[in-house]
Amino acid sequence: MKKNLLFFLAASCLFSCQQQDEQQEPSKKTFSFSASIDNESITDALTRSSSTLSLPAKSSFSDGDVISMSASEQDYLPFTIGMENPAWDAIDTDAEAVTFYAHYPELSDDVATRSFGSRYRGITGGKEFLFGMAQAAKGSWNVALKFKRMTVPVILLDEKRQPYEGSAIVKLFLKNKGVQDLFNGKIEADKDAKPEYINIRKISEGILTNLLPQRIKAGETIGTVIVDDKEEPIIVDEDIELTPDTPVAISLYRGRGIIDERTPLRR
């Protein structure tokens, strides 16, 4: 009986010591990720148009989506949301607060090294680029990444502020080559890039066209509208700043167009 009691006490002590060790060593814990996308600007665009309008833009992440993530200035590694629970001891840092950086879509191998020598990469517009950050105390159970859009989605609307489904073909003539800072996600149009024609997709085509952030000056011809085989230039009446995460809503009228109800276009 005494032997059993001693064994029980020894086992209890061992279990208690293990618990204390785990509490004292947060690096041994695993943690999970949650990832969300800031949709405020998209929501504002929808509210100005129609409460029932939905856009083919990335508005949330699903289990199985792959992002590229860097923790504590380390290289970017692919991470599958909802499928992996990394351990804190895999992060080589003594800091109590750890900063995470993430890109979506996943980065290619040639730019996954996080260093000043590979800080920038060239990109082509047209699709969405998202960047997220989070800070968490080492040993936390959850790390919540918040993503923002780094590009400018374009929404084609009709006179009633509904998705445009007419026969007009809209092409914008803007810079479509850019440079991204992989440390903070910021994208700028390449200063040496020449404008090129960019086909603007309708909402019904399943994916929005995304532009690169850039400044457009009043009086510039920024594209064309083709209706019934007739091509008309699109001319900007005021300066426009295309800013990341802020959609451009172009309403097509019979004789003119409007960008975001503020900047008129002439045709």
Stretches with model-predicted labels:
Residues 4, 17-267:
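Sec-type signal peptide cleavage vicinity
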Residues 1-15:
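Sec-dependent bacterial lipoprotein signal peptides
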